[in-house]
Amino acid sequence: MAKEKFDRSKPHVNIGTIGHVDHGKTTLTAAITTVLAKKGFADAQAYDQIDGAPEERERGITISTAHVEYQTDNRHYAHVDCPGHADYVKNMITGAAQMDGAILVVSAADGPMPQTREHILLSRQVGVPYIVVFMNKCDMVDDEELLELVEMEIRDLLTEYEFPGDDIPVIKGSALKALQGEADWEAKIDELMEAVDSYIPTPERDTDKPFMMPVEDVFSITGRGTVATGRVERGQVKVGDEVEVIGIEEESKKVVVTGVEMFRKLLDYAEAGDNIGALLRGVAREDIQRGQVLAKPGSITPHTNFKAETYVLTKEEGGRHTPFFNNYRPQFYFRTTDVTGIVTLPEGTEMVMPGDNIELAVELIAPIAIEDGTKFSIREGGRTVGAGVVSNISK
């Protein structure tokens, strides 16, 4: 069969499989590609191709992730599947694979298990907005009442972590039987993809979000003003727009963008992904510095106190060799700069070991533009010892 051309006209969505070890995440991923391949919507991937995912490095952290792509009638999907539990934790915290929605795989024969709970909690903390459930291995359970019981358990668990447990689609199927080509079970994969299509909304594109650009460098051009350079993280900025300079200083300042330059050419506007120089009126060279952001006024605010879901690197990953304790004071690297912060451990936690995944409370010594979902690295003397994502802002 001839390879299909990548169809840009379909909206793109990032999803992934989550759930307890051996409940069938990878088998389901293989089954989705195999069933969709029959419609010409995917390249069929065997279990082994997905399971043997190569290791990648994201912010100094080693993660194994398999990436597959496929499409439905309505959309194009990029799908991530991780071999090990630790890979999920790292993946979700570093945002190496940002998910617009997830397929939670639960074995009907076992019901929800510890990692089922952990992955739901992680999804809540790092901001995976939507979950669809695939109850797998239903061919192994003859008792209809037992299936209903497991479904109720899953729904209750989702509700416990503030997902709409009563409304979430739950599809009962068998990934293995679908993979083996049994028509009744293949239909369940179609049903799952219809649920994913309709229940997980198409995400807002980065260019449609409010403008933000982390400042990387600043210099002045005599007679013209101050230029701040950086990569536009989201939204767009036009010549004449008023933007706010946020972070590091106590007070945010409003300035006007009088010019936008890229590759030494003048532009009318710039958008997410562009590396630009923004010419600013009404601000001196010393009033703006690396680590601040330019943003649409009112869209993001500076904070010093927050809670964060973090992963602490192991010794093998180049992290610490020893645990850290309450009042640990590392550097927190947000976007383009390091800021010292003081760590408070959760009640009842004496220390944090390399390899741990934990929610920390942090107080920065200077305010930084952050919001729920902002990613950062934890560093000591320039080397990365952890990664985190803001889960709750307190001040």
Curated annotation (Swiss-Prot):
Region of interest: G2: 60-64
Cellular component, GO annotation: cytosol
Residue numbers spanned by region G4: 136-139
PROSITE patterns hit by this protein: G_TR_1, G_TR_2
Source organism, top-level taxon: Bacteria
Post-translational modification: Phosphorylated on serine and/or threonine residue(s). Dephosphorylated by stp.
InterPro entries referenced in this protein's UniProt entry, alphabetically: EF-Tu_GTP-bd, EF-Tu_GTPase, EFTu-like_2, EFTU_2, G_TR_CS, P-loop_NTPase, Small_GTP-bd, T_Tr_GTP-bd_dom
Major localization class: cytoplasm
Subcellular location: Cytoplasm
HAMAP family: EF_Tu_B (MF_00118_B)
Protein name: Elongation factor Tu
Gene name per UniProt: tuf
